[in-house]
Amino acid sequence: MQLNSTEISELIKQRIVEFDLTSIIYNEGIILSVIDGIIRIHGLSEVMQGEMIALPGNSFAIALNLERDEVGAVVMGPYSHLTEGMKVKCTGRILEVPVGHSLLGRIVNTLGIPIDGKGKLENKLFSPIETNAPNVIERQSISEPIQTGYKSIDAMIPIGRGQRELIIGDRQTGKSTLAIDTIINQRNSDIKCIYVAIGQKASTINNVVQKLEEHNALINTIIVTATASDSVALQYLAPYAGCVMGEYFRNIGENALVIYDDLSKQAIAYRQISLLLRRPPGREAYPGDIFYLHSRLLERAARVSANYVETYTKGKIKGKTGSLTALPIIETQAGDVSSFIPTNVISITDGQIFLESSLFNAGIRPAVNPGISVSRVGSAAQTKIIKTVSSGIRTTLAQYRELEAFSQFASDLDEVTRKQINYGKKVTELLKQKQHMPMSVSQQALVLFAAEQGYLEDINLKKINDFETQLLLYVKHQYHDFMKIIDQEGNYNDDIEKTLTEIISKFKTNASF
């Protein structure tokens, strides 16, 4: 069969019409160098700041330096397989991590990938790690407390839902323990917890997981880890990943608590990245935007209004406010709170809890220095009963410290001064608390009421701890319903004061101290 020229022409036209070529446009570049996890790329003319760059071997980098002729990017993970001349391409996406209730009880890395051996996440929700903080109109004033379970903190340095309270101190002063105990104390509350471990040993993180499991608190907690063996990029990004996981709960009208342990290591990781990218170093060799590194993270902690929640959920949730509370941890060197990173974070947060080595070594745990520890907004959220019964504790301790310093130089003290010093010692002893043993509101109220009303005056200093232990056992059996009401309502009135007085009077009559 022979085809004439007309038929051939028609056949070619038909094939041209039917031909379908899907063209995909890539913005490609070529790796110029790979040094210490930093890659320099020629090309990528359309890349965005913070965009993910697809690398060979199913790995990714994040673009941080956008220069005239090349792009500086940091590799997320191992980079030994990367060599000069390899092709890379833009993805058009910012880094996203999984969010939602399915993460509760799981241990994930910075990218939200589970590392606890419990299988894949059943999750369909993702969110970019960099989001804008709620503006002033979208926020609501802080009016509800977060109970840490520590008498000294809940009484003198109260923390509210939506607050940012810095925990600062030298190494081995109990900073992480305080944070972990705060998580343990939320096990029966509606607060979801996120613990972000930055630059820590894997064995340390394993101990934290075991403690949370022992106290049945892991079920309500997400642990985000970037260990010391992980790349600096993952250590730098870990707090933002943890923050966005907490923001999800805030935005749907729930309450979340995020702990960054610790931001000093994140700052060091970011300094390392910046120096490798050849950015100009500033004070202590940190880059010029180190303040912005922490401010854009901590400003995302807030209590948001019901309108904000309603808008975010597209009308599905109405009349509920949400909150994200942040407890960043900063490690100081030899108690120097005036160095660069500590002063930056102090100026960003709503207060700080300062833990002192000298107090810790003297056996005062938690080693809180009430003189320079402060909560700027938490008092508005403090439970009424705790606020009332602890009103004089800070003053008592301040007078005690002043008189104790004075007594070291004075040979003879009058009776009033001696009494004040002795009572200050007893209050200090009463505020001591063992780790992983948080106290309920009612227990704190009872013990602080005893201190405030002078019931410790006739008790020997060495018997203070026994007095507290036996008093709490006594009320647990004799006044269980009364204590439950205080835990639920937190109110304080004449009837409650009368009952508290009756409890302690009866206890002291029956017990001998």
Curated annotation (Swiss-Prot):
The record marks S373 as: Required for activity. GO terms for cellular component: plasma membrane; proton-transporting ATP synthase complex. It comes from the Bacteria. PANTHER family: ATP SYNTHASE SUBUNIT ALPHA, MITOCHONDRIAL. Produces ATP from ADP in the presence of a proton gradient across the membrane. The alpha chain is a regulatory subunit. Belongs to the ATPase alpha/beta chains family. HAMAP family: ATP_synth_alpha_bact. This is ATP synthase subunit alpha. It comes from Baumannia cicadellinicola subsp. Homalodisca coagulata. The gene is atpA.
